[in-house]
Design a protein with these regions (language model features):
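Short connector loops at helix/strand junctions that flank enzyme active sites
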Residues: 3, 26, 31, 75-79, ...
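Conserved Nudix-box catalytic region and its N-terminal flanking loop in Nudix hydrolases
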Residues: 16-52, 56
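Nudix hydrolase/Nudix homology domain
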Residues: 27-28, 97-163
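Active-site segment of metal-dependent pyrophosphate-handling enzymes
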Residues: 55-90
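Short, well-ordered beta-strand micro-motif
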Residues: 10, 81-85, 102-105
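Conserved N-terminal beta-strand and adjoining loop/helix that marks the start
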Residues: 1-18, 35
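Structural detector for helix-capping/boundary residues
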Residues: 34, 48, 61, 104-107
Length: 163
């Protein structure tokens, strides 16, 4: 069954930097994101996930758009992307899902930044009045690596939960 998630491109006050978190599981850089929980609005999910993954409390600024990723395991995923700005908190309070939280210039993102994330940031910078609606496809080899990584992460989490 397809899932629904929310992601947030968090900009600095001067709009010259974007907040990224380095994921604990795959060690890649991405924006704060996660699945929508029962009864949550998109905005509530965005605020919760950003605080959990980065330690920062944010205010939602703008809806960027909807990205359908049909190849993701479980029947695909729709990601609703927003922009936000920090209104409190500190990076030192990030949760276990992140091993690092840092600000980067959009033109100087780290090499291990997820390809889709680069697109979300670019679309956020354009500032279009109309929300974007895109389908994002991945190469077959990337899908296979992702599936293997998710299986290994699941096994690791089960082992960790039993220790």
């Amino acid at each position: 069954m397809a899932t629904k998630s929310v992601g947030v491109v968090v900009f600095s006050e001067d709009q010259k930097s974007v907040l990224l978190q380095k994921r604990e599981d795959f060690r890649v850089w991405g924006i704060p994101s996660g699945r929508i929980e029962n009864g949550e609005t998109h905005e509530e999910t965005a605020i919760r996930e950003t605080q959990e993954e980065t330690g920062y409390l944010i205010q939602i600024e703008r809806y960027v758009g909807e990205y359908w990723r049909p190849q993701l395991p479980g029947g695909g995923d729709t990601l609703y992307v927003y922009t936000g700005r920090v209104i409190g908190g500190k990076a030192e309070d990030h949760g276990w899902e992140s091993v690092a939280v840092e600000w980067f210039a959009p033109q100087q993102l780290p090499g291990r930044t997820v390809r889709f994330v680069r697109e979300y940031i670019a679309d956020s910078l354009i500032g279009s009045i109309e929300p974007v609606k895109k389908t994002q496809l991945l190469p077959w080899w990337y899908i296979n690596l992702l599936r293997a990584g998710l299986i290994l992460r699941g096994i690791r989490n089960q082992v960790r939960d039993h220790l």
